[in-house]
Amino acid sequence: MINISKKAQEHFTSLLSNEPENTQIRVFIVNPGTPNAECGVAFCPENEIELSDIQLKYDGFFVYVNKDTISYLKNSVIDLVTDKIGSQLTLKAPYAKNNFSKKVSSSLEEKVKCFLNLEINPQLSMHGGRVELIKIDKNGIAAIQFSGGCNGCSMIGSTLKETVEKKLLSSFSEIKKVYDETHHLHGQHSFY
């Protein structure tokens, strides 16, 4: 799925040797399927691995990718390019800006779930978080639930209002209000 050159794999192995035990690599994409899509690579501590992640095995380490964004990383190449100035990792993802959601969803809930997975969760996943739609009632109230780094985060009020609610209300006229059903417990998993 993601082709990592031998030089880049050796570079990752070297970098990981200086990190806490069981730290791996995360490849992520922000704003997938849009002209503003951006890919990135980061360290992935063991406590930031999510149930929604796909694990890819390489020589001496694993790469984790959120399953909802894996199609955007099809045929991606990570390489270590060296020139006179030094070396730099490059990530080329030819499908990052493709819109795979062109199929017509059969329900508002499906459309909202797709929207959350494509527009909101890639941003939240950078902090180890995620949001899921629980239901939309007949009055247009969307019940959502946060998990991972978002659960118990002191910034959740801002994330709910400024990121999730604002984008859902502007994208779906049928939604009148967004309600957070998460039982927030602050802990080591919380981002802030």
UniProtKB/Swiss-Prot annotation:
What are its cofactors? Answer: [4Fe-4S] cluster
Q: How does it assemble?
A: Homodimer.
Which InterPro entries does the entry link to? Fe/S_biogenesis_protein_NfuA, FeS_biogenesis, FSCA_dom_sf, HesB-like_dom_sf, NIF_FeS_clus_asmbl_NifU_C
The record's similarity note reads:
Belongs to the NfuA family.
The record's gene field reads nfuA
Q: What is this protein called?
A: Fe/S biogenesis protein NfuA
Q: How many and how are cofactors bound here?
A: Binds 1 [4Fe-4S] cluster per subunit. The cluster is presumably bound at the interface of two monomers.
Q: Which UniProt keywords apply?
A: 4Fe-4S, Iron, Iron-sulfur, Metal-binding
Q: Which GO terms describe its biological process?
A: iron-sulfur cluster assembly; protein maturation
Annotated function: Involved in iron-sulfur cluster biogenesis. Binds a 4Fe-4S cluster, can transfer this cluster to apoproteins, and thereby intervenes in the maturation of Fe/S proteins. Could also act as a scaffold/chaperone for damaged Fe/S proteins.
- Sites binding [4Fe-4S] cluster sit at C150, C153
Q: Which organism is it from?
A: Buchnera aphidicola subsp. Acyrthosiphon pisum (strain APS)
Molecular function per GO:
4 iron, 4 sulfur cluster binding; iron ion binding
